[in-house]
Amino acid sequence: MCGIICFIQYGGQKIDLVSCLNCLDKLNNRGPDAQSYQVIELGDITIFLGFTRLAIMDTSEAGLQPFKDNNSNYSICNGEIYNYKNLAEKFNIEMQSQCDCEILLPLFNLRGFEGLLSDLDAEFATVIVDKYNSKLYAARDKYGVRPLYYGYNCEKGLIGFASELKALHSVMEYVEQVKPNQYVTIDLSFRPSIPFDLQNFVKLFQFTNYHEYYQSHKSLIDYHEPNIEQLQTSINHLLTEAVRKRLYADRQIGFLLSGGLDSSLIVAIATRLLGPTNIVCFSVGFEGSPDVAAAREVVKFLGIKNHHIVPFSVDIGLNAINDVIKTIETYDITTIRASTPQFIMAKYIQENTDIRVLLSGEGSDEIHGSYKYMRSAPNSQEFHKETIRLLEELYLFDNKRTDRTMAGNGLEVRVPFLDFNYVDFIMNIDPNLLMYKSDYIEKKIIRDAFKGYLPENILYRPKEAFSDAVSSKEINWYRSIQKITEEIYTDEKLQNSNYKFNKPEIKEALYYRDIFNSHYGGRDHIIPHYWLPRFQQNNVLDPSATILPI
């Protein structure tokens, strides 16, 4: 991970360099290895580009950003560009370093910004200053693996972009996430009056869709009769390649192993590619949790010797929740429940090992439609529409959790299940083949594609929510939180809470909201709604799958 930040100061005012650097410092967690910045003058506009580095590819100073080209254009990027060598060869680009992000400026000069976006096989968030044409561009990868926020301060004539909310919160009136399927263009030749008004904002920010999410109206007639064996071969090949391309780094790579199907498959594939002696796994949970037991079985089956089990308990979790919410920048219930043990695990990795790059199984449940509530989807069309919605909103929930818990501890996470080629293939499979049926388990076609990779009882282990599975039979993590919040809040206090937007309906939600508000007051809109299951007859207020009547 790295941290990026950009400020644009209008009106001929001198940019507040001290304030810019203070905001940049708030991203040091994402990039603890180095910090750098560039101030760019463009007439009466001043641009600040800042970068905090976690050195992964080319750990020398040659990989330190911002990058600058002969046209005095600049780029900053938080990302991993997996096809940068292929692009350099294809377009005859001479690289000055081995840093993958160096490819952006020469590629931009050859292909333009939309062409650049279409060429990248990457997880990224980037800002490019085209000084020659007086344009600024900002975008993130199409599934939102890497974060990017924008904001503005009308009174000061200031616009900003940053990797995290915390870097903009103190200086911006308004902050919002850049949507993963959009890029932002700012015309630097336009000179708005200060303070900004709404008309200025509309002229300044141009949002363009560069990726359309998958069709939501597909029906059975859109699909040819499938050859199941060929489908499984393709699934195996594409996921293997997704893992393979994410194993390249100039730092040692580790693996987050929950013990569930998704992370276990990633570890099993990597073991076949690298050999068991080169695999280091990390698991977290209560002693006696089903996840920890399953993870132990996986590493034993694969012959992996280096397996760290990070202890977790109610007290450890409760003591960390304030830091967790400040780090992950949300008040969503299920995100915080799952983030807490993951944050504890990330902290352990950072403090006790030299590993700084990790592979994880995030994104699988969304694209495969394997959440428990998806069993209630009335038909294949509604099932498919819901997987699209989940994919579109990943940046609000699970991607935010995984990015922040890892980056908050100076680590980088890579997610093979969100590989572009793999997602494209899965989203074009007949949804009937992914839907849960009474006679077989969810994701059966995926499981069958990897027979022999894992013990049968792990390969066909039913899904459990991460925050549930880290618990033990005796002690449940989220129910322990709810017990505490029952003691903190009365029914009357819950009913009369001052939060109008996304009003907390349970005491646990109010507890999280109060903590969030203490750090990011006035930013309630940063998530449009809570993550909750669909297709339920009754109004569901708790996201845990354990309470669903299925």
UniProtKB/Swiss-Prot annotation:
Query: Which chain positions lie within coiled-coil regions?
Result: none
Species, as recorded: Acanthamoeba polyphaga mimivirus (APMV)
Q: Which UniProt keywords apply?
A: Amino-acid biosynthesis, Asparagine biosynthesis, ATP-binding, Glutamine amidotransferase, Ligase, Nucleotide-binding
What NCBIfam families would the database entry show?
A: asn_synth_AEB (TIGR01536)
At the highest ranks, the source species' classification is:
Viruses, Varidnaviria, Bamfordvirae, Nucleocytoviricota, Megaviricetes
Q: Which GO terms describe its molecular function?
A: asparagine synthase (glutamine-hydrolyzing) activity; ATP binding
- Name all Glutamine amidotransferase type-2 domain ranges: 2-189
Catalysis performed (reactions): L-aspartate + L-glutamine + ATP + H2O = L-asparagine + L-glutamate + AMP + diphosphate + H(+)
Active site: which residues?
C2 (for gatase activity)
SS bond partners: none
Q: Which GO terms describe its biological process?
A: L-asparagine biosynthetic process
**InterPro entries noted in UniProt:** Asn_synth_AEB, Asn_synthase, Asn_Synthetase, AsnB_N, GATase_2_dom, Ntn_hydrolases_N, Rossmann-like_a/b/a_fold
Q: Which Gene3D superfamilies match?
A: Glutamine Phosphoribosylpyrophosphate, subunit 1, domain 1, HUPs
Which residues bear the site annotation Important for beta-aspartyl-AMP intermediate formation?
E362
Return the broad EC class.
ligase
Q: What's the Enzyme Commission number for this chain?
A: 6.3.5.4
Name the UniProt record assigns to this protein: Probable asparagine synthetase [glutamine-hydrolyzing]
Q: Which residues bind L-glutamine?
A: R53, L54, A55, I56, M57, N78, G79, E80, D100
Span of domain Asparagine synthetase: 213-530
**Pathway annotation:** Amino-acid biosynthesis; L-asparagine biosynthesis; L-asparagine from L-aspartate (L-Gln route): step 1/1
Q: Where does ATP bind?
A: L256, V284, S360, G361
> Which Pfam family name is an example for this entry?
GATase_7
